Amino acid sequence: LICFICFSPTAH
């Protein structure tokens, strides 16, 4: 999913 709040490469 695309996360606009977490800008971490591991979060995507």
From Swiss-Prot:
Q: Name one GO cellular component term.
A: extracellular region
Organ and tissue specificity: Expressed by the venom gland.
Query: Where does it reside?
Result: Secreted
PTM annotation, UniProt: Contains 4 disulfide bonds.
A GO MF term? toxin activity
Give the UniProt keywords, A-Z: Disulfide bond, G-protein coupled acetylcholine receptor impairing toxin, G-protein coupled receptor impairing toxin, Neurotoxin, Postsynaptic neurotoxin, Secreted, Toxin
Q: Which family does it belong to?
A: Belongs to the three-finger toxin family.
What this protein is called in its record is Muscarinic toxin Mlalpha
> Which source organism?
Micrurus lemniscatus
